[in-house]
Regions:
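PLP-dependent amino-acid enzyme catalytic core
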Residues: 1-309
Length: 309
């Protein structure tokens, strides 16, 4: 296949059955790690920038500034590299060093904020930076309607093509809320039996009505309910702890040969918790958000297995 640039390769990601982790159930995972920037956020990065171009919100001299926990930043950095935009990314210092290096490799500038302030601190800092200069634009992934819209128009359509027989359960994490919103809204029109469950860290259960807090599951659990998240389409939320998320991230690699990130492991742990309520013949879908290669430096996640002869 030939493409004019790398951005044309975003989307059309494969779906794989998890036959070893869940041998007695019909559980599938959509591999968003196969996007060129390595995550599901490539979709919204391109969508937000192209929507802003179409609406005249940005030009070649615009400085783009965005708060991000990592994957959206990587996607924006990749898109900005191709399109030639100046990009500054603001992220909590608790995010992995691999993410920072990836964004820097694409040419983005990085500003770190205190870990205890979470994403709220990164958002506030991005606003502060934008107010200091002229001709700046903040994509605002947590509020930008292009976020769920791209999932309605692409991700959900791909799933419909792959699952003509239907999907019964969507169990997936909430970062911005864009993919669970866009996918669920479209799938429920075709498959009214679909039940959608959000996955969130047990240390920051805001969708479940709890208080925000620091946690170790990078990529989900922003500490607030994002504006783009349609909570009306959710049947509920499943809380997952660090150890469960780490364990399933490790098992996914060792048993299924899929190297995913921590949030992917969290979604698998959530599925394991819900299995008792799921009929064996039901179709369950989750999302692999990114690649585990972004988390080598996370203590206790992936350990070396060196033996001496």
């Amino acid at each position: 296949m030939k493409f004019n640039n790398v951005l044309e390769t975003i989307g059309k990601t494969p779906v794989v059955r998890l036959s070893k982790l869940f041998p007695n159930h019909n559980v599938w995972i959509k591999l968003e790690r196969t996007n060129p920037g390595g995550s599901v956020k490539d979709r919204i990065a391109l969508a937000m920038i192209e929507a802003a171009e179409k609406e005249g919100k940005i030009n070649k001299d615009t400085k783009i500034i965005e708060p991000t926990s990592g994957n959206t930043g990587v996607g924006l950095a990749m898109v900005s590299a191709v399109k030639g935009y100046d990009l500054t990314l603001v992220m909590p210092e608790s995010m992995s060093v691999e993410r920072r290096k990836l964004m820097s490799a694409y040419g983005a500038k990085i500003v770190l904020t205190p870990r205890e302030l979470g994403m709220k601190g990164a958002i506030a800092k991005a606003q502060e930076l934008a107010e200091k200069e002229n001709n700046t634009w903040i994509p605002q992934q947590f509020e930008n309607t292009a976020n769920p819209e791209i999932h309605r128009n692409t991700t959900a359509q791909e799933i419909l093509n792959d699952f003509s027989e239907g999907v019964d359960f969507l169990i997936t994490g909430v970062g911005t809320g864009g993919h669970i919103t866009g996918i669920s809204e479209i799938l429920k029109q075709r498959f009214p039996q679909l039940k959608a469950f959000a996955v969130e860290p047990e240390q920051s259960p805001v969708i479940s009505g709890g208080a925000p807090g620091p946690h170790a599951i990078q990529g989900i659990g922003a500490g607030f309910i994002p504006a783009v998240l349609n909570t009306d389409i959710l049947e509920g939320a499943v809380l997952v702890g660090k150890d469960e998320a780490f364990s399933f991230t490790q098992r996914l690699a060792k048993e299924e040969g899929i190297l995913g990130g921590i949030s992917t492991g969290a979604s698998l742990a959530a599925i394991a918790k819900k299995l008792g309520e799921i009929p064996q013949n039901a179709t369950v879908l989750t999302i692999n958000y990114d690649t585990g290669e972004r988390y080598w430096s996370v203590d206790g996640l992936f350990e070396e297995n060196i033996i001496s002869e």
